[in-house]
Amino acid sequence: MIYQANKRQFGALEGLAHWCAEYYYTLERLGADDAEMPAIRKDVSFCMDRCDALGVPYWAQNAALAWAENWRATKAEYFDAAMAKRGITCKGGATA
């Protein structure tokens, strides 16, 4: 599948990936009982709702989440390159 997002949609996907990576980083480093976990879960939920409101397909959201679950991958590969490998691009080029 191929999905060409506009800049707002692509930015929302990037935000979703960021908070997903933050969730797994915090989970690994500090555990599920860390005081920040409820706020991080709320941020992930907000980002998912934002993607839904902007019309981002679920498979594209899932691709961003699957990439960000391995938070180390977010340190080794740029988001736009990772999404391009999964058929997700941004109209007009990467967001700056």
Task: Explain the meaning of each model-derived region.
Residues 1-96:
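Non-transmembrane, aqueous-exposed alpha-helical and coiled segments at domain scale
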